[in-house]
Amino acid sequence: MPNVEKMYTYLRGYLNGAGMSESLKALQYARKAHDGQCRRDGTPYIVHPLSMACYAVALGVADDNIIATILLHDVVEDCDRQVEYLPVNDTIKRAVKYMTITTFDTDTSKIETKCRYFNELLDCREALICKALDRYNNLADMPANFTSDGTAKNVAETEVLLLPILKKAKEKYADLADILFVLRTNLTTLCDAIKPQCYGEWTKWSCIYKREDTKS
């Protein structure tokens, strides 16, 4: 199991040295907000944003707003916190809002919402990078913790909705082109590795998302 204290200490030292004041506030806030929460496999929930932030640093992400968004991306949806009260600037609050999905009652409306959600990510660079890292981290854990159908749904969603948006983003955010390329490549490789384990379900979800995305 990942050592939360070591990850937290590493990030705090890096962020302090890099002068990332917003991310330092986000780091402390996220740890308190996620205190006591666990993932499906029993791992402390804070490991998820910490892992994402460490990966972002390794990729060369040096944007304070992006790292802070990564650390805070689940606190509104999972910790019952209000975005307007987060202790960070308005750019980060906006990005966290982009990362938060409104849920509906029917499966159809959920799919429509997801299509709209991914398309709108193109308007927010911080949320876009955060979502790519979020999806990579989640996909890596899915085969062991999700049903075959749930895993297939997320793989199809990634291929049909997220990867095309990341490709478009290279033109809009030229300074992030290298990072976007690495994220797209890694996500594609991971999807290709998982897909054979749930191919039948993946075919179903891929058709559903493609059909809905064509409408949007």
Regions found by a protein language model. Name each.
Residues M1-S216:
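Active-site helical microenvironments for divalent-metal-assisted chemistry
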